[in-house]
């Protein structure tokens, strides 16, 4: 269920400060964050944000199509290893 329009988009203040600082300085280093719940804002376009997936920080390069989505959508938390193979089918 999407967030109410009257509330507006959410972004953690500490992440917003880091992004503004990176934009001012023109720094190309990834902005490290644990805030997967923050919405991607237009001033983040062109930055690389390292989003934590529970184990490591996944670098996410922000493009204009990503605006309005959450950071966590681009850093998967689960790895799919495939289903168990059928032992009967392997023997034949």
From Swiss-Prot:
GO terms for biological process: ribosomal small subunit assembly; translation. Belongs to the universal ribosomal protein uS19 family. InterPro entries: Ribosomal_uS19, Ribosomal_uS19_bac-type, Ribosomal_uS19_CS, Ribosomal_uS19_SF. Protein S19 forms a complex with S13 that binds strongly to the 16S ribosomal RNA. This is Small ribosomal subunit protein uS19. It comes from Proteus mirabilis (strain HI4320). NCBIfam families: rpsS_bact. One of its GO terms (molecular function) is rRNA binding.
């Amino acid at each position: 269920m999407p967030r109410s329009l009257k509330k507006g988009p959410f972004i953690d203040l500490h992440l917003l400060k880091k992004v503004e600082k990176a934009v001012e300085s023109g720094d190309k280093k990834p902005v490290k964050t644990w805030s997967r719940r923050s919405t991607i804002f237009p001033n983040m376009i062109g930055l690389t944000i390292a989003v934590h997936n529970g184990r490591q920080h996944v670098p996410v390069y922000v493009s204009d199509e990503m605006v309005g989505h959450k950071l966590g959508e681009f850093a998967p938390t689960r790895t799919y290893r495939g289903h168990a193979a059928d032992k009967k089918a392997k023997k034949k």
